Amino acid sequence: MSDINLPLSFSDAAATRVKMLIAEEENPALKLRVYITGGGCSGFQYGFTFDESVNEGDTTIENSGVTLVVDPMSLQYLIGGVVDYTEGLEGSRFFVNNPNATTTCGCGASFSV
Protein backbone atom coordinates (compact mmCIF):
# COMPACT_ATOMS: atom_id res chain seq x y z
CA MET A 1 0.00 0.00 0.00
CA SER A 2 2.70 2.45 -0.97
CA ASP A 3 0.51 4.47 -3.35
CA ILE A 4 -0.60 7.41 -1.21
CA ASN A 5 -2.83 8.81 -3.98
CA LEU A 6 -5.47 6.10 -3.65
CA PRO A 7 -8.90 7.43 -2.63
CA LEU A 8 -9.50 4.52 -0.25
CA SER A 9 -7.19 2.22 1.71
CA PHE A 10 -7.41 -1.57 2.03
CA SER A 11 -5.77 -2.68 5.29
CA ASP A 12 -3.38 -5.59 5.59
CA ALA A 13 -5.79 -7.29 8.03
CA ALA A 14 -8.67 -7.04 5.55
CA ALA A 15 -6.50 -8.23 2.65
CA THR A 16 -5.26 -11.22 4.66
CA ARG A 17 -8.81 -12.25 5.57
CA VAL A 18 -10.04 -11.82 1.98
CA LYS A 19 -7.14 -13.97 0.76
CA MET A 20 -8.15 -16.72 3.21
CA LEU A 21 -11.81 -16.56 2.15
CA ILE A 22 -10.91 -16.68 -1.54
CA ALA A 23 -8.73 -19.74 -0.90
CA GLU A 24 -11.66 -21.43 0.88
CA GLU A 25 -13.91 -20.72 -2.13
CA GLU A 26 -11.20 -22.02 -4.50
CA ASN A 27 -11.93 -19.18 -6.94
CA PRO A 28 -8.93 -16.88 -7.48
CA ALA A 29 -11.06 -14.56 -9.65
CA LEU A 30 -13.01 -13.30 -6.61
CA LYS A 31 -12.60 -9.72 -5.43
CA LEU A 32 -14.06 -7.99 -2.37
CA ARG A 33 -16.63 -5.39 -3.40
CA VAL A 34 -17.58 -2.69 -0.90
CA TYR A 35 -20.68 -0.60 -1.58
CA ILE A 36 -23.04 1.87 0.05
CA THR A 37 -26.81 1.46 0.20
CA GLY A 38 -29.56 3.52 1.78
CA GLY A 39 -30.79 2.20 5.09
CA GLY A 40 -29.67 1.41 8.58
CA CYS A 41 -30.37 3.59 11.57
CA SER A 42 -28.11 6.41 10.34
CA GLY A 43 -29.19 6.70 6.68
CA PHE A 44 -26.51 4.77 4.77
CA GLN A 45 -25.03 1.35 5.33
CA TYR A 46 -21.96 -0.50 4.16
CA GLY A 47 -22.18 -3.70 2.18
CA PHE A 48 -19.51 -6.27 1.38
CA THR A 49 -19.74 -9.05 -1.17
CA PHE A 50 -17.49 -11.15 -3.36
CA ASP A 51 -17.58 -10.40 -7.07
CA GLU A 52 -15.71 -11.84 -10.05
CA SER A 53 -16.15 -8.80 -12.26
CA VAL A 54 -14.95 -5.22 -12.37
CA ASN A 55 -17.44 -2.89 -14.03
CA GLU A 56 -16.66 0.18 -16.09
CA GLY A 57 -15.92 3.08 -13.77
CA ASP A 58 -15.10 0.89 -10.77
CA THR A 59 -12.04 1.72 -8.69
CA THR A 60 -9.77 -1.20 -7.78
CA ILE A 61 -7.27 -1.26 -4.93
CA GLU A 62 -4.84 -4.14 -4.46
CA ASN A 63 -3.10 -5.37 -1.35
CA SER A 64 -1.22 -8.66 -0.89
CA GLY A 65 -2.46 -10.04 -4.19
CA VAL A 66 -6.17 -9.45 -3.54
CA THR A 67 -8.40 -6.76 -5.01
CA LEU A 68 -10.95 -4.42 -3.44
CA VAL A 69 -13.55 -3.04 -5.87
CA VAL A 70 -15.72 0.07 -5.36
CA ASP A 71 -18.34 1.50 -7.70
CA PRO A 72 -18.17 5.26 -8.44
CA MET A 73 -21.38 6.13 -6.55
CA SER A 74 -20.16 4.42 -3.37
CA LEU A 75 -16.63 5.77 -3.68
CA GLN A 76 -17.80 9.36 -3.16
CA TYR A 77 -18.88 8.41 0.38
CA LEU A 78 -15.71 6.44 1.10
CA ILE A 79 -12.93 8.82 0.00
CA GLY A 80 -10.17 8.88 2.58
CA GLY A 81 -11.53 5.81 4.38
CA VAL A 82 -9.97 2.50 5.29
CA VAL A 83 -11.58 -0.90 4.66
CA ASP A 84 -10.46 -3.03 7.58
CA TYR A 85 -11.18 -6.33 9.33
CA THR A 86 -11.45 -7.07 13.04
CA GLU A 87 -11.95 -10.06 15.29
CA GLY A 88 -13.11 -9.56 18.85
CA LEU A 89 -15.65 -10.45 21.51
CA GLU A 90 -18.46 -9.18 19.28
CA GLY A 91 -17.38 -11.48 16.44
CA SER A 92 -15.43 -10.87 13.27
CA ARG A 93 -16.34 -8.42 10.55
CA PHE A 94 -15.19 -6.16 7.77
CA PHE A 95 -15.77 -2.48 8.50
CA VAL A 96 -14.96 0.95 7.12
CA ASN A 97 -13.13 3.61 9.10
CA ASN A 98 -14.81 6.51 7.30
CA PRO A 99 -13.70 10.12 7.90
CA ASN A 100 -16.74 11.37 5.95
CA ALA A 101 -19.24 9.93 8.43
CA THR A 102 -20.64 12.61 10.72
CA THR A 103 -22.55 10.07 12.79
CA THR A 104 -22.47 6.29 12.99
CA CYS A 105 -24.71 3.77 14.67
CA GLY A 106 -23.51 1.83 17.69
CA CYS A 107 -22.43 -1.20 15.69
CA GLY A 108 -20.71 0.87 12.99
CA ALA A 109 -22.69 -0.70 10.16
CA SER A 110 -24.49 2.50 9.16
CA PHE A 111 -23.57 6.17 8.97
CA SER A 112 -24.66 9.62 7.83
CA VAL A 113 -22.74 12.37 6.05
UniProtKB/Swiss-Prot annotation:
Q: Which Pfam families match?
A: Fe-S_biosyn
Q: Which UniProt keywords apply?
A: Iron, Iron-sulfur, Metal-binding
Single Gene Ontology MF annotation? 2 iron, 2 sulfur cluster binding
Which positions are annotated as binding iron-sulfur cluster?
Answer: C41, C105, C107
Q: Which GO terms describe its cellular component?
A: cytosol
Q: How does the cofactor attach, per the note?
A: Binds 1 iron-sulfur cluster per subunit.
Q: What InterPro entries has UniProt attached to this entry?
A: FeS_biogenesis, FeS_cluster_insertion, FeS_cluster_insertion_CS, FeS_cluster_insertion_RrpA, HesB-like_dom_sf
Task: Give the stretches traversing the membrane.
Answer: none
Assembly and partners?
Answer: Homodimer.
Q: What does this protein do?
A: Required for insertion of 4Fe-4S clusters for at least IspG.
The family assignment reads: Belongs to the HesB/IscA family.
Q: What is the protein name for this chain?
A: Iron-sulfur cluster insertion protein ErpA
Its ancestry begins with: Bacteria, Pseudomonadati, Pseudomonadota, Gammaproteobacteria, Vibrionales
